[in-house]
Amino acid sequence: MANDKGDISKDGVSRRKFLGGAVIGAAAAAGVGSQILSLSATAQGADKERVGPLQSNVDYDAVVIGGGFAGVTAARELSRSGLKTLVLEGRSRLGGRTFTSKLDGEKVELGGTWVHWTQPNVWTEVMHYGLEIEETVGLASPETVIWVTDNQVKRAPAAEAFEIFGAACTEYYKEAHNIYPRPFDPFFAKKALQEMDGLSASEYLNKLSLTREQKDMMDSWLSGNGHNYPETIAYSEIMRWFALSNFNMPTMFDSIARYKIKSGTVSLLEAMVAESDMEVQLSTPVLKVKQDSHRVLITTEEGTIAASAVVMAVPLNTMGDVEYSPRLSDAKSEIASQGHAGKGVKGYIRIKQDVGNVMTYAPARNDVTPFTSVFTDHVGENGTLLIAFSADPKLVDINDSKAVEKALHPLLPGVEVTSSYGYDWNLDPFSKGTWCTYRPGQTTRYLTELQKREGRLFFAGSDMANGWRGFIDGAIESGREVGYQVASYLKGKNSNA
């Protein structure tokens, strides 16, 4: 079994120790509150009167393993279909790789944050629940850009810097329409995708006749998109984000880092759960999933649950931590072993000074700063709140304010850091990474296979979405589709019984 004895996982943290508090985590270290949506470990919703499952030999029609946006969406769709549904979540909260928390009493998003109308699934939900939107100003509309090239720091008005960067982007993205003419249908131009999918983001960059300055700015951008070093990121992944943004750079800036939910991503989760009669059980890691032709048995440390179908809605990098019987397909096992590339750092930094709306670029490897990008979230009474990214968590401890201040000084000389805060998703045994970024070759080799059901076992998640993979939108896309598939499957089975 995977970690059923509290064994140490390959990243050095067991799931049992994580839940037991041996890993303090960023929230405790920074002295801030955890995510608002934290239900009791008993099944939320279990006190409601409900019709029993369709089959007499099971406890639930469907069990959803994983309580991120994909899992919650799938569970909502299943419960809407009249199916008795349980969500099992290993953490003590819902939300997956989204995490609404606080820094100095102010709301921050430690994981997934931004939404946009180019992301139709999440935008529909935001509008449906009447949630308000606010803006992050620094990335999409900076006044000043600071960049590192050849280990030298440059500074210029945004318009001047974007002339350099924009010309590089025009060259880099020139194949995007050929690869993804219909970006929500990733294999529509399958031959073109296959020809380019094996390239890394850095390999393609090195093919281009750009200046050193342009390549350094692009390296920063690629690292920020993929949350790792560019050689680990598939070139096709970079093209996908651009295609989904209507093949337009200003729209891409707005789509990936401008608009966010004013009340936090947690408020969208709360609304989705409230509209459903799903049951939710937290702090319940799943150890084993065993299926036969009649039902699925899910084993946790608390016992065994029987269901007619199971939705695996866990991050790709944790898929292999559950024991499956029969074992998963070779393709799923292979990519679960490889993992996706998203492994970087995201953090919030509060400084005393008002530095205005700034944006910084630095290649993932440089001698100046560990931050590939830093930009203004907003300027307030207590100074400026910045959002910072790094390709490698080994380069900077985002929760060490002194280290963060030292890393900022080459970019913003003299600033005083009063607090800094981030969450190491790599140490979290229920994520083992940040947002999903496919490695070279993984899209064409594994995406279709990841989406295939295996018997009574279905698979959902942002990590296997067709469109905005790695975003909240992709999670909702996948969860909705799989919820519909499972409902159709179960009702079809029942009607034919």
UniProtKB/Swiss-Prot annotation:
Post-translational modification: Predicted to be exported by the Tat system. The position of the signal peptide cleavage has not been experimentally proven.
Entry binding sites for FAD: A70, E89, R97, W114, V286, S462, I472
Subcellular location field: Periplasm
EC top class, as a word: oxidoreductase
GO cellular component, one term: periplasmic space
Top-level division of the source organism's lineage: Bacteria
Pathway named in the protein's UniProt entry: Alkaloid degradation; nicotine degradation
Cofactor(s) annotated in UniProt: FAD
Listed InterPro entries: Amino_oxidase (IPR002937), FAD/NAD-bd_sf (IPR036188), Flavin_amine_oxidase (IPR001613), Flavin_MAO (IPR050703), TAT_signal (IPR006311)
Reactions the enzyme catalyzes: pseudooxynicotine + 2 Fe(III)-[cytochrome c] + H2O = 4-oxo-4-(pyridin-3-yl)butanal + methylamine + 2 Fe(II)-[cytochrome c] + 2 H(+)
Biological processes per GO annotation: alkaloid metabolic process; nicotine catabolic process
Gene Ontology MF: a single term: FAD binding
Family, similarity comment: Belongs to the flavin monoamine oxidase family.
Subunit structure: Homodimer.
Name of the molecule in the record: Pseudooxynicotine dehydrogenase
Organism from which the protein derives: Pseudomonas sp
